[in-house]
Design a protein with these regions (language model features):
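Positively charged n-region of N-terminal signal peptides that target proteins for export
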Residues: 1-6
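Bacterial N-terminal signal peptides
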Residues: 7-17
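N-terminal post-signal-peptidase region of extra-cytosolic proteins
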Residues: 72-81
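A short, sequence-level motif marking secondary-structure junctions
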Residues: 64-66, 89-90, 108-113, 189-192, ...
């Protein structure tokens, strides 16, 4: 009888370990990152800020990323912003304005485009670089991941990410401040094949209870794997990012 009990206990322990392994939050988040973008790539984006009266302001950006925490951006449109560039190295961010002629430090919660998307959204690193998974729930065809910022320098203290279980792509993300206040909700949609094994949402929409009636949309295009020289991701290269295109 005691042998049977020990056997049942062992079976239950094994089943628990198997269940935990099946919903390994860290592995899920890393796969989400891999499915959204390669480790090193270039892409184009259109950003659309929509005001309560329906008026819009649009931006077109070229972006390049190398490794886990190096990223540059180049404004192509509108003409008033064309030539401006951005650089992110880890938690540090800069904006280069041709008329100023030197890089200016900016923060993750500011926005170089105005509207709801902040600099952390525009120059987003892999989620697994900035957040750790604190809980995972299986909810039908989705996973619900609770994420906690690894450092105080991260724009959002906590994220709730709903992930499509089959595609391992994000569906929605709720971003919270340390106080528990909801800052914004991000919604991914319109999954497209960008080629070379990259299949991901082409549209990201956001709204915020802090900006009632305002919306913002990010459209992704021409995502391609590409490697760059290390000098591209330096302050001295910010005035030359246009040479990458």
């Amino acid at each position: 009888m005691q042998r049977l009990i020990r056997l049942l206990v062992c079976c239950l322990a094994f089943a628990g370990q198997a269940s935990f392994a099946a919903v390994d939050g860290k592995a899920i988040l890393e796969k989400v990152d891999k499915n959204l973008t390669p480790e090193s790539y270039e892409m184009y984006r259109k950003l659309i800020n929509i005001e309560p009266d329906g008026s819009r302001k649009e931006f077109v950006l070229y972006t390049a990323k190398q490794g886990r925490d190096s990223m540059v951006g180049l404004f192509l449109e509108p003409a008033t912003d064309a030539g401006r560039t951005t650089l992110r190295l880890g938690d540090n961010m800069w904006l280069y304005i041709p008329d100023v002629g030197r890089p200016i430090r900016i923060t993750s919660l500011q926005s170089v485009v105005g509207g709801i998307f902040n600099n952390a959204d525009l120059m987003r690193l892999d989620f697994s670089t900035e957040y750790e998974v604190t809980a995972v729930e299986e909810q039908g065809k989705t996973y619900r991941l609770s994420l906690k910022a690894r450092t105080d320098a991260v724009a959002y203290d906590r994220l709730i990410m709903v992930v499509d279980r089959a595609a391992l792509l994000p569906l929605t993300i709720e971003a919270y401040a340390a106080s528990g206040m909801l800052i914004k909700t991000l919604r991914y949609r319109d999954v497209k094949d960008f080629g070379d094994g990259i299949r991901r949402p082409a549209v990201l929409e956001t709204d915020s209870p802090l900006y009632q009636g305002y919306k913002a949309v990010m459209l992704f295009a021409k995502i391609k794997r590409r490697s760059f020289r290390d000098e591209v991701f330096t302050l001295n290269y910010m005035s030359r990012i246009k040479e990458l295109r």
